């Protein structure tokens, strides 16, 4: 993973704590994912493999670009705790002054974001604004 390659990042309801999710077979989507990713509770090689690429498990002390990370309290695909836990660890480890924003949607919004055209446009405007502010475009 090479965070230095990016001037900014949008992580929109990201699946960043793959290993913890895969270890919890009480979550409704986890058992079905064993066919795709393997069962890390049952097989050590799947545990090690998932840990090798899981974003949460691969954070380390370094500079990270400015980030806008989103989640939704009503998302049943990526629990809001995953991005929240990720951003907390990232803030603890980062070695720069770049902003790491966390936005958790508390209104009815699922994995795909806000419903309704106006709300979707507002979200898109916030995301573009974040990227443009951090693009460091010179006049």
Protein language model features and the residues they cover:
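Active-site-proximal cap/loop segments of hydrolase catalytic domains
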Residues: 1-139
């Amino acid at each position: 993973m090479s965070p230095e390659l990016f001037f900014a990042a949008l992580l929109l309801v990201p699946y960043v704590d793959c290993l913890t999710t895969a270890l919890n077979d009480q979550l409704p989507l986890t058992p079905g994912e064993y066919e795709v990713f393997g069962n890390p509770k049952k097989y050590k090689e799947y545990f090690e493999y998932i840990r090798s690429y899981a974003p949460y498990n691969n954070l380390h002390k370094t500079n990270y670009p400015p980030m806008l990370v989103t989640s939704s309290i009503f998302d049943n695909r990526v629990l809001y705790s995953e991005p929240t836990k990720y951003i907390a660890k990232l803030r603890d480890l980062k070695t720069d002054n770049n902003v790491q924003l966390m936005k958790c949607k508390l209104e009815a919004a699922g994995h795909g974001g806000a419903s309704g055209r106006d709300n979707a446009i507002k979200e898109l405007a916030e995301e573009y604004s974040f990227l443009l502010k951090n693009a460091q475009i010179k006049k």
